[in-house]
Amino acid sequence: RKGWFKAMKSIAKFIAKEKLKEHL
């Protein structure tokens, strides 16, 4: 279960990075 939470966090971070790229 902990691994799943960690994976969700990394995915959220990745999505946030992609969104930032779009704004720049």
Swiss-Prot record:
Keywords assigned by UniProt, alphabetized: Antibiotic, Antimicrobial, Fungicide, Hypotensive agent, Membrane, Secreted, Target cell membrane, Target membrane, Vasoactive
Coiled-coil boundaries: none
Keyword Membrane applies: yes
Cell compartment(s), UniProt: Secreted; Target cell membrane
Signal peptide: none
CC per GO annotation: extracellular region; membrane; other organism cell membrane
GO biological process: blood vessel diameter maintenance; defense response to bacterium; defense response to fungus; killing of cells of another organism; regulation of blood pressure
Biotechnology: When conjugated to gold nanoparticles (LGNPs) or gold nanorods (LGNRs), this peptide has great potential in cancer-targeting delivery and photothermal therapy.
Family of the protein in this entry: Belongs to the cationic peptide 04 (cupiennin) family. 05 subfamily.
Protein purpose: Antimicrobial peptide that inhibits many reference strains of bacteria and fungi. Is potent against Candida species and multidrug-resistant Acinetobacter baumannii (MDRAB). Is probably localized in the cytoplasm after being transported through the cell wall and membrane. Is able to interact with cell membranes and enter into cell plasma to activate the mitochondrial death pathway to sensitize cancer cells for apoptosis, as well as up-regulates p27 to inhibit cell proliferation. It shows very low effect on normal cells, such as erythrocytes, Hek293t cells.
Subunit structure as annotated in this protein's UniProt entry: Monomer in solution. Small size oligomers on the lipid membranes.
Stated name of the protein: Lycosin-I
Source taxonomy: Eukaryota, Metazoa, Ecdysozoa, Arthropoda, Chelicerata
